[in-house]
């Protein structure tokens, strides 16, 4: 089954029912980690090649903590149209898309558009991952001091991808 002629039956089955690509291939366990290198950690716009070590590190975390295979895709474009087109054309090879270190405000449009055109989960880590961690930390801190979230005011400093998403998640 590793190669011809054994792969013909799965190929024909997927042709008839494309959703079988998730069970008859590695697709369901493969995530693309996508960046344009414009908001890499605290380093800023360092470019896609310089962002590769971070993307490789994220791929290693996927493997170590979830046994998910991940592949870095560092795109040499800051144009949302080109990024969306490139990722959407490659989406058939993956079970999910993890957007990483793409600067605001373009990251919002890119994520939204990819969610509209891809039939797999699309997640911008800098927005939602950070917001979930902040929400968990806030709820735990409130539990420690014995307060309800309705009793406090929360200040968010920054209006980048993380700050805006934190605000949206806390509302």
Protein language model regions, located:
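N-terminal ligand-binding/catalytic initiation module
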Residues: 1-122
């Amino acid at each position: 089954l590793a190669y011809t002629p054994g792969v013909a039956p799965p190929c024909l089955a997927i042709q008839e029912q494309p959703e079988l690509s998730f069970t008859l291939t590695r697709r369901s366990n493969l995530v693309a980690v996508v960046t344009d290198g414009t908001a890499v950690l605290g380093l800023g716009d360092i470019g896609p090649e310089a962002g590769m070590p971070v993307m490789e590190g994220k791929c290693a975390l996927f493997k170590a903590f979830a046994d998910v295979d991940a592949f870095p895709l560092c795109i040499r474009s800051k144009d949302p149209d080109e990024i969306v087109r490139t990722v959407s054309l490659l989406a058939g090879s993956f079970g999910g898309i993890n957007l990483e270190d793409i600067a605001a405000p373009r990251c919002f449009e890119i994520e939204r558009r990819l969610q509209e055109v891809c039939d797999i989960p699309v997640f911008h880590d800098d927005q939602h991952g950070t917001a979930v961690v902040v929400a968990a930390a806030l709820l735990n801190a409130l539990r420690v001091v014995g307060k309800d979230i309705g009793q406090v005011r929360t200040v968010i400093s920054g209006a980048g991808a993380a700050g805006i998403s934190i605000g949206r998640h806390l509302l």
